[in-house]
């Protein structure tokens, strides 16, 4: 994929642009909805191509209902977007893809354009789903999207899947993040979240030159819907505005922590992150 040393040209009257290729989550807590709210909150003009529609089923213990967008419809969305902003759109986030066919469609579209930043949130399953749901997308994501990424934000499960390592400590998380960077060449923000022992939520940033542990006290004892989506979207927005990868990681961590502290409660098993937490 072509890469250039493009310098973002934007202001309050001409904001930076960012595209998310992701799924819709009906309650507004995660997915493309979270991405667009994050972009808007951080002063970036958000654009979306939908890959799937996901909804919780209140009659079935809030399990996920998953409806893939046909690949030809995804392609039509991407054609419209890339035709409308051929010069200015240089930053993209990849979220929930949902199937190998969709992954291949997204990857082909990315290869047809030049990008400064490709942020991969390597979503293999929706929050609350069993790991087995990841099996059919795992290999396609590694083969098609990871090589295109300039930055990736795997959670604990995804870090283990992408690195092939078991992660039980901060040291393990650091080693796994290094491994993912070696495989992909991308900057990595590996998220320990609630899964590592201790009082702090620990993430590890690795870009080949820098290794930095980003740590802050845990808030609550359970995960929050939209935290991973919003973290990757915040990284994307900051990169679109011209931040370095490390600056983007630090600011995204702060953004998500503030949103978790003011999470929106509903009847689903997970509260939803509030993107306005830093106001």
Residue ranges and their predicted role:
Residues 21-27, 212-225:
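Short pre-catalytic strand/loop immediately N-terminal to key active-site residues, enriched for Gly-Thr
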Residues 68, 246-279:
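Charged C-terminal helix
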Residues 43-47, 212, 238-252:
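Phosphate-handling active-site elements
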Residues 2-20, 32, 36-129:
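Conserved N-terminal subdomain of the carbohydrate kinase-like
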Residues 135-211:
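Conserved phosphate/ATP/ADP-binding segment of small-molecule kinases
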Residues 6-15, 31, 198-214:
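Acidic-glycine-rich active-site phosphate/pyrophosphate-binding loop
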Residues 160-161, 221-245:
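Short, small-residue alpha-helix embedded
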Residues 61-68, 130-136, 164-168, 220:
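Short glycine-enriched, charge-decorated loop/helix-capping segments at active-site entrances
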């Amino acid at each position: 994929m072509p890469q250039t040393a493009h310098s973002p040209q934007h202001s309050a009257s001409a904001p930076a642009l960012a595209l998310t290729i992701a799924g819709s989550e009906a309650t507004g807590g995660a997915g493309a909805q979270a991405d667009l709210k994050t972009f808007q909150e951080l002063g970036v003009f958000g654009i979306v191509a939908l890959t799937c529609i996901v909804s919780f089923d209140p009659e079935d213990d809030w399990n996920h209902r998953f409806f893939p967008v046909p690949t030809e419809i995804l392609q039509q969305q991407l054609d419209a977007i890339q035709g409308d902003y051929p010069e200015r759109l240089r930053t993209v986030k990849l979220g929930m893809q949902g199937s190998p066919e969709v992954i291949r469609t997204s990857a082909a579209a990315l290869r047809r354009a030049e990008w400064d930043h490709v942020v991969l949130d390597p979503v293999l399953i929706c929050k609350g789903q069993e790991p087995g749901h990841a099996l059919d997308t795992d290999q396609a994501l590694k083969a098609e999207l990871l090589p295109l990424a300039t930055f990736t934000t795997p959670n604990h499960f995804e870090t283990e899947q992408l690195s092939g390592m078991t992660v039980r400590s901060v040291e393990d998380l650091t080693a796994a993040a290094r491994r993912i960077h070696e495989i992909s060449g991308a900057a990595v923000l590996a998220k320990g979240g609630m899964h590592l022992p201790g009082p702090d939520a620990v993430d590890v940033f690795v870009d080949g030159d820098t290794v930095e542990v980003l740590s802050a006290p845990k808030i609550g004892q359970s995960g929050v819907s939209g935290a991973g989506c919003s973290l990757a979207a915040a990284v994307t927005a900051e990169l679109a505005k011209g931040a370095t990868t490390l600056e983007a990681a630090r600011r995204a961590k702060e953004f998500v922590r503030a949103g978790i502290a003011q999470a929106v409660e509903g009847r689903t098993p997970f509260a939803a992150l509030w993107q306005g937490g830093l106001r």
